[in-house]
């Protein structure tokens, strides 16, 4: 079994209403994480995208984000488990590395709830 470690972390600005797109939001955190790890997108051999589409009006963001971040043609997985999406994504990345299927996996968790009104957000919880 391969050893696993989190080697870089990043986070976009935490604001009430992010002014950019979902791609830009994820890129901000991704850029910080790969810088923290001393990696480039080319060093990553798989990615896990984690979100809840009910809140950000983006039904299937995995492929779009992987392409935007320069992670293609590597495998990209999509995890959707509402509030636990990112922790579920970390578990998937752990399994991918311990199994030997992949060596370096980026986990990209995001939520942009400002795309819908507060009342809509509460209805969807």
Indicate where each model-derived feature is located.
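Conserved "HGTGT" condensation-loop signature of ketosynthase/thiolase-family condensing enzymes
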Residues: 1-76, 95-99, 106-125
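Active-site nucleophile and cofactor-binding loops and adjacent substrate-binding regions
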Residues: 76-86
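Conserved phosphate-binding catalytic cores of ATP/NTP-utilizing and phosphoryl-transfer enzymes
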Residues: 87-95
């Amino acid at each position: 079994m391969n050893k696993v470690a989190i080697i870089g972390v990043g986070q976009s600005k935490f604001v009430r209403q992010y002014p950019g797109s979902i791609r830009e939001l994820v890129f901000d955190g991704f850029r910080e994480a790969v810088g923290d790890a001393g990696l480039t997108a080319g060093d990553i051999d798989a990615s896990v995208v984690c979100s809840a589409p009910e809140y950000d009006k983006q039904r299937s963001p995995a492929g779009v984000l992987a392409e935007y971040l320069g992670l293609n043609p590597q495998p990209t997985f999509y995890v959707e488990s509402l509030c636990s999406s990112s922790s579920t994504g970390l578990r998937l990345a752990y399994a991918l590395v311990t199994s030997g299927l992949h060596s370096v996996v980026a986990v990209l968790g995001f939520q942009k709830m400002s795309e819908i009104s507060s009342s809509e957000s509460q209805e969807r919880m």
